Amino acid sequence: MLTQKTKDIVKATAPVLAEHGYDIIKCFYQRMFEAHPELKNVFNMAHQEQGQQQQALARAVYAYAENIEDPNSLMAVLKNIANKHASLGVKPEQYPIVGEHLLAAIKEVLGNAATDDIISAWAQAYGNLADVLMGMESELYERSAEQPGGWKGWRTFVIREKRPESDVITSFILEPADGGPVVNFEPGQYTSVAIDVPALGLQQIRQYSLSDMPNGRSYRISVKREGGGPQPPGYVSNLLHDHVNVGDQVKLAAPYGSFHIDVDAKTPIVLISGGVGLTPMVSMLKVALQAPPRQVVFVHGARNSAVHAMRDRLREAAKTYENLDLFVFYDQPLPEDVQGRDYDYPGLVDVKQIEKSILLPDADYYICGPIPFMRMQHDALKNLGIHEARIHYEVFGPDLFAE
């Protein structure tokens, strides 16, 4: 239990840490990776190169300090972090390593301003946070391992099918190499794929949404090829596209994630996705359309038909199920793309154009896609009067959503 003095010191020094946050976290990662290079196998090194992980962690540290009087206000955030950590296989013995180098980085960057009292207060605050997360992660690990088909840590899977879904998205059907069943999951959850990346000389781990409904035998992930932009190409995603084939093996974590629908609810859901963000939505959609059926609105944005994954199956579902309304936006339609057949509206997803169709009593709204897309849709829903508690979103990698 933190003393009031400790809380006061942490709150008082939060603005200073925010001012120097990026430098502190950059120093922290340098120190930690030099002392423990094996942790490079856990952290996303692409995000390290781009500085995204540093920004996200600096912001998280500041948010924790700002809310230290009422940590329950951060419970949703901590739940997301715990699920991510569980999917990475984070171990309790790694927390003291992080704490040691974080405190050393604060001392190094702030110099004499980081007094013994300040370092002691932050050590206690970090220890308290670590205890909360370790408890949550232990519960997640045990819950997964106890379920039929469940496991803890990594399990070897075999690629049984590799299916192109568009010019940039490919689906992989994975079955356990041991021939056993797989644990069911909540529609919207993800698995982690661990694979050796020769270009880095490291194992790297990435999260991918499970893009089909649970069947107890296999999982499907749908992976976008990365590249062509200002950021480095996706190490793992492109490796899966170019070098992983049917019969090859990869390691998977059990499903985790707090972004999922309530399968027992009967209230409407509105799914809003951009690009490869449709992958968790497809799982949600399939389950929601089962008995008891519930009203579903699926809104998707893509550049055009060439990169619109699963479009024919979604159109067919919209024709088959009376409780499903589908709206597709293309912002760069091809000459052969026909409005009314391939897509419904030109331009970026604009929920204002379909306001009457998505403003449903007691509906929950789920958003997934690139971060700028999610910010835009979140703000648009808020402007339509949707309560924050009804809006749910998924971010893979560092959570830079709330800038």
From Swiss-Prot:
SUPFAM superfamilies linked to this entry: Ferredoxin reductase-like, C-terminal NADP-linked domain, Globin-like, Riboflavin synthase domain-like
Outcome when changing A60Y: Does not affect phospholipid-binding
Cofactor note: Binds 1 FAD per subunit.
Expression induction or repression: Under oxygen-limited conditions.
One GO cellular component, as annotated: cytoplasm
Ranges of residues in domain FAD-binding FR-type: 152-262
PROSITE patterns, per database record: FAD_FR, GLOBIN
Enzyme Commission number(s): 1.14.12.17
UniProt site positions, description: Involved in heme-bound ligand stabilization and O-O bond activation: Y29
Known function: Is involved in NO detoxification in an aerobic process, termed nitric oxide dioxygenase (NOD) reaction that utilizes O(2) and NAD(P)H to convert NO to nitrate, which protects the bacterium from various noxious nitrogen compounds. Therefore, plays a central role in the inducible response to nitrosative stress.
HAMAP family in the cross-refs: Hmp
Miscellaneous remark of the record: No protein-heme interactions have been detected at the distal side of the heme molecule. FHP is able to bind phospholipids with high affinity.
Similarity-based family: Belongs to the globin family. Two-domain flavohemoproteins subfamily.
Protein name: Flavohemoprotein
UniProt lineage: Bacteria, Pseudomonadati, Pseudomonadota, Betaproteobacteria, Burkholderiales
